[in-house]
Amino acid sequence: YVDPDEDTLGRMQQLKLEEQEKKELLQTLKGRENITIDGKKIMLYANIGNSKDLAAVLQNDAGGIGLFRSEFIYLERDTFPTEEEQFQIYRTVAETMAGKPVIIRTLDIGADKKCDYFEMEPEENPAMGCRAIRICLTRPEIFKTQLRALFRASAFGNISIMYPMIISVDELRKIKTIVAEIRQELTEQGVTFGEPKQGIMIETPAAVMMSEELAKEVDFFSIGTNDLTQYTLAIDRQNPKLDAFYDPHHPAVLRMIQMVVENAHK
């Protein structure tokens, strides 16, 4: 709001106050075990966009990093980051977390996240277009640079790699071919690297329906409920006119989550 009226200003101030009260309440819970109402112990991980977020992660005693959005490394600059630049960032994060899990999502550009120097063609429906793993598989030189940096950095901490927008076993097998090439290259070059766990994001109905088969190909799943809700309910989550219809607790979404969990544990 550029010039809010008194009512709007009052509502915003109330929201700000409520948010501050929530933060203060959460601070009183820091250091306690995370146990659900039905007695399940869970770990609370942080989401970050760059290494600058690490201070807050440590301050709030997170159990690890559940999602490092690596695309922000690309979005915050005007040229492609080099392998060495990425390696140093990933290594810093891994070493700072001192053995705690760090799950790094590979480049998830496209849709609502655009980067001019990628020179991507305009699309009528970007959310359904060339994004995430589709870009990585069609532009392998970008993908390989990132994967080399990730494998190198994994020698310095508990890094896992997560691939976004996977919809088929075929995509995973293409990724595995690229990973095998990278391992061979690094070995021949005498470069130290680790063996990070590799997982995928489940964020489309196709991935849900294929989750039993996909589980056989990877080490872990992460359910991306924002996109899964959008694609399941056929609702553009960027459209404010549809806010009332965007429901992550819709029975269809909850059933899909249940299906993924059951298939992952088979």
Regions found by a protein language model. Give the residues of each.
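Phosphate-binding P-loop/Walker A region and its immediate neighborhood
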Residues: 16-19
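Conserved alpha/beta-domain cores
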Residues: 24-266
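Conserved glycine-bearing catalytic or ligand-binding loops at nucleotide- and phosphate-handling centers
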Residues: 1-14
